[in-house]
Design a protein with these regions (language model features):
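Active-site beta-to-alpha loop of glycosyltransferases that engages the nucleotide-sugar donor
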Residues: 61-67
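Cell-envelope/extracellular polymer assembly enzymes that use nucleotide-activated donors
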Residues: 56
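Catalytic core and acceptor-binding pocket of nucleotide-sugar-dependent glycosyltransferases
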Residues: 192-193, 212-292
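Membrane-proximal basic amphipathic "stem/tether" segments
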Residues: 1-52, 296-309
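Short internal beta-strands
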Residues: 85-92, 187-189
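Short, acidic, metal-binding catalytic loop of nucleotide-sugar glycosyltransferases
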Residues: 75-83
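GT-A fold catalytic core of metal-dependent nucleotide-sugar glycosyltransferases
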Residues: 145-196
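Active-site-proximal specificity loops/subdomain of glycosyltransferases
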Residues: 99, 103-151
């Protein structure tokens, strides 16, 4: 069944690349970047940059996503001139040797193994039981909500997916992390009129009616927040009113509801994007599943060219 799914995925991407007339070079890049992630990561030279700012960046990735993660990190370090402590969360597929290899490529990166994260939640007594129960959700992405929050150790935190790249200077992030912003959270939003379903009951929706629209717009591909402003009680309340812990948006709607309760803003839609090209003035692009081929076919090499120019 998994093989059939992979074949269908590749046929989908092939049709897209044919439809938009991708040339031989893009096909070569797609094959190279997608199918040889660990091999390519092993070959890159280590980068040693001292941590120069007081915030943490948390990313979760499978082993096959390490090449994407590598370029997400490289693009941010280059464009922002910030060097935070970066914690890459293992989804359970990264072996010890591969984890140590990836850590060796950056002086500021630590891989947190899934087993260690599981042990933390199992043995930490002051985490409410409802949080521990929610973490056992069938929706894998719940880990990018709970693990990234509870395992972060700085007041300011950035969270991204691993399928993101920065193509310009992220001034909004720089200002926030350096204390030049008056808000306590900023997040990436869906383009246009798109809204997410919020799997919460009517009482909760009524109580927070004034922020529901903002919460429903959040996309968790890029969020930044002041952790000290988020109350544990707010997270507990969200799960107490969640209608289905296994809902596919339980994580994303959770971030939306929690972050929308504190002073917040959206990243500008004109420069932080899902769709379209990556030329100026685009700063950031989230290469979500239907557009993942774009990251492999031209996104990674665009970043490489910017860094080497």
């Amino acid at each position: 069944m998994q093989l059939i799914s992979k074949i269908k995925e590749e046929l989908f991407f092939a049709r897209k690349m044919i439809q938009y007339r991708y040339g031989p070079r893009c096909w070569y890049r797609y094959i190279k970047n997608k199918f040889f992630p660990v091999f390519l990561t092993r070959r890159v030279q280590p980068i040693s940059i001292p941590v120069n700012c007081d915030f943490e960046w948390h990313i979760m990735t499978p082993k096959r996503g390490l090449w994407m993660t590598y370029w997400a990190i490289r693009s941010f370090l280059y464009q922002s001139n910030l060097c935070p402590k970066i914690i890459v969360h293992d989804d359970g597929t990264i072996d010890e040797a591969t984890a140590r290899m990836f850590e060796s490529k950056f002086s500021n990166v630590k891989i947190l193994r899934r087993l260690d994260a599981d042990k933390f939640f199992d043995t930490t007594s002051n985490i409410p039981n409802i949080i521990k129960r929610a973490r056992k959700s069938k929706c894998f992405f719940i880990l990018t909500f709970l693990d990234h929050f509870f395992l972060s150790n700085s007041s300011k935190v950035m969270i991204t997916d691993n399928d993101v790249l920065f193509f310009g200077k992220p001034q909004e992030i720089i200002d926030f992390m350096l204390g030049a912003s008056k808000i306590d959270a900023m997040y990436f939003v869906g383009e246009g009129e798109g809204r997410n379903a919020l799997p919460v009951d009517s009482l909760y929706k009524k109580k927070y009616a004034d922020i529901l629209d903002d919460a429903a717009r959040l996309n968790s591909g890029l969020i930044i927040f002041n952790k000290s402003k988020i109350k544990l009680e707010s997270m507990v309340e969200y799960f107490e009113h969640a209608t289905d812990f296994d809902h596919h948006l339980i994580e994303q709607s959770g971030w939306g509801m929690i972050l929308s309760q504190i002073p917040h803003a959206f990243f500008p839609e004109a420069t932080y994007k899902f769709r379209g090209g990556v030329e100026f003035p685009v700063i950031f692009k989230h290469f979500t599943s239907p557009r993942r081929h774009e990251m492999f076919a031209y996104g990674i090499d665009k970043v490489r060219q910017q860094i080497n120019s």
